[in-house]
UniProtKB/Swiss-Prot annotation:
Residues 90-429 are annotated as: Disordered. The gene is ELF5. This is Protein EARLY FLOWERING 5. It comes from the Eukaryota. InterPro entries: WW_dom-bd_prot_11 (IPR019007). Residues 177-186, 203-215, 226-241, 294-304, 334-343, 368-379, 402-424 have a biased composition (Pro residues). It comes from Poncirus trifoliata (Hardy orange).
Length: 540
């Protein structure tokens, strides 16, 4: 426990702060002492001696006053202190094994002569810090560095003849290894030129291979654009279904044979192999393009038993589609895959919707009872419309199949999208019910609710603000005030003429009744509420 001088116990925080203050004072004292010592060490004892000598000469002449005597005494003390501190510093540095550094050996800053000024303004190559008699005679700085001159660093120290000769010999020795590299450079340039004669011959060689490869690379890229890896697996599954349906899988095999034939037309080794691989990919795409033509028939079986005639017609259409695919194989590759799924609904459509061709035309298909079908039905009318110009009957639906099969070369897209067509099958099943359903409900479904629940007029300040002050008076204070009655009727009659003359008559009758009966303000307020109700303000 620390106590003050009076014997009182100090607060621990105050005691701690007092200790910190003492430590800070000690630290400041040491710092001031160091600064003083450094200032003493920087002083030149010779200058102090010169000043003392001048004062002694003045003392001999008898012109030394009291102030100069005091100054002389201070100079003598500082001289003794400087010598003492220097001696201590030298001893400390010797103990540490370091050489003492004194600042007194540096004279006052010297101004440059006119010659040095001129030389600084117009430097010579020899003044450059990067100058070398043989390697860099111009003194140019290396790239990325600013020019540096010895004159800006300090005075040049002229080299003696021996040193100059030794430096020249050293520079020659250093220069000897450097010149050898330049000769090989021209040799390498010549070799490069010699190789250049071969390089031009080799340069034209690379270009020829690329031209034949672009088609293959383009085919490969096109193949990659229509996922090639997934395509092969689906076709093997459907072919058995096609066989069951009664259609032979010969078309895919024929394009494969044709694909085997193209490679020979003029390629060497690797090029032939690349072409074979690319053509095999193309053949796979062709086979996949023709397989879908046979794939459409399978969907009808799950739909209805009328698949047999429809499948035949689908087979004929598929053959025509296969011909179109063979003729236009490049177009389907560039066309986006989304269209193919829309073809499937059109394929089963002919067999399911021949009896109701007129239902396909109207855009009101979205009004069918099942909620899920409307979106696909909204999408269907535009698809069915193009076929109708060719023919109003279901054969017209087959017309879009001829141009659209090329859009669906990838069979991979068709298997996952059968879930989309089922709504169309259901629509075919409900074909008998379609004509009875009105088309207006579709608009009603899309319409937003018009009835909005509003608060009562008594609770809306916007409407109560319209009520006259005479009516808004409390019932307790309303009894003595019977004069405002005519004003209420007048205000009501004046406000209502612009709105509706019929309401004005009713309001006049209502206002006349209280006048004749001489009832209280409550009756007039009820009449006002009736007027407001007639205007539609109290509709809930």
């Amino acid at each position: 426990m620390k106590t003050t001088k009076g014997g009182k116990v100090m607060n621990p925080t105050d005691a701690y702060r007092k200790e910190l203050r003492k430590k800070e004072l000690k630290r400041n004292k040491k710092e001031r002492k160091k600064v003083r010592e450094v200032g003493i060490l920087k002083k030149d004892p010779e200058q102090i001696r010169e000043q003392i000598e001048k004062l002694e000469m003045m003392k001999a002449d008898g012109a030394l006053d009291k102030a100069r005597k005091h100054k002389k005494r201070q100079l003598e003390d500082t001289l003794n202190l400087v010598l003492k501190k220097r001696k201590e510093l030298q001893e400390k540095m010797k103990e540490k094994g370091e050489t003492p550094v004194m600042f007194s050996h540096l004279g006052p800053p010297r101004r440059r002569t006119a010659e040095e000024e001129e030389r600084a303004k117009h430097p010579k190559p020899e003044d450059s810090a990067y100058y070398h008699p043989t390697l860099n005679p111009t003194g140019a700085p290396p790239p990325g560095k600013p020019p540096m001159y010895l004159s800006s660093i300090g005075p040049r120290i002229p080299l003696s003849s021996d040193e100059a000769s030794s430096s020249k010999t050293e520079s020659d020795d250093v220069a000897l290894p450097v010149p050898p590299p330049p000769p090989p450079l021209p040799d390498s340039g010549r070799l490069g030129s010699g190789d250049g004669s071969v390089i031009p011959a080799s340069l034209p060689l690379p270009p020829p291979p690329p031209p034949p490869k672009p088609p293959t690379s383009a085919g490969a890229n096109l193949g990659m654009s229509l996922p090639p890896p997934p395509l092969p697996p689906p076709p093997p599954g459907p072919p058995p279904k096609d066989l069951v349906a009664g259609q032979p899988p010969l078309p895919p095999s024929q394009p494969l044979q044709q694909s085997v034939q193209p490679p020979p037309p003029g390629m060497s080794g690797s090029e032939r192999e690349g072409s074979l691989s690319a053509l095999s990919d193309d053949s796979i795409f062709k086979a996949s393009a023709q397989v879908p033509s046979t794939l459409p028939p399978p969907p009808p079986p799950p739909g209805m038993p009328q698949k047999s005639p429809n499948t035949e017609s689908g087979g004929t259409a598929s053959e025509a589609d296969g011909n179109n695919l063979s003729t236009t194989t490049d177009l389907p590759k560039m066309v986006p895959p989304p269209p193919p799924p829309r073809q499937q609904p059109t394929v089963p459509g002919p067999g399911l919707m021949p009896s109701v061709p007129a239902d396909v035309l109207p855009p009101g298909l979205s009004s069918f009872p099942p909620p899920p079908p409307p979106p696909p039905l909204d999408m269907r009318p535009p698809l069915s419309a193009p076929g109708i110009p060719g023919g109003a009957n279901h054969p017209g639906m087959m017309v879009p199949l001829v141009p659209r099969p090329p859009y669906g070369p990838p069979p991979m897209m068709r298997p996952p999208l059968p879930p989309g067509p089922p709504p169309t099958l259901q629509e075919g099943e409900y074909a008998a019910n379609r004509p009875t359903v009105p088309q207006k409900p579709s608009y009603v479904k899309s319409a937003a609710p018009t009835v909005v629940k509003r608060p009562l007029a008594q609770h809306t300040p916007e409407l109560t603000a319209m009520v006259p002050a005479s009516v808004r008076v409390r019932r307790e204070t309303a009894l003595p005030k019977a004069k405002p009655k005519p004003s209420v009727s007048t205000t009501v009659t004046t406000i209502q003429p612009a709105t509706a003359p019929v309401v004005r008559q009713e309001s006049i009758a209502c206002s006349a009744a209280p006048k004749s009966q001489g009832k209280s303000i409550d009756d007039s307020y009820m009449a006002f509420l009736e007027d407001m109700k007639a205007l539609g303000a109290l509709d809930s």
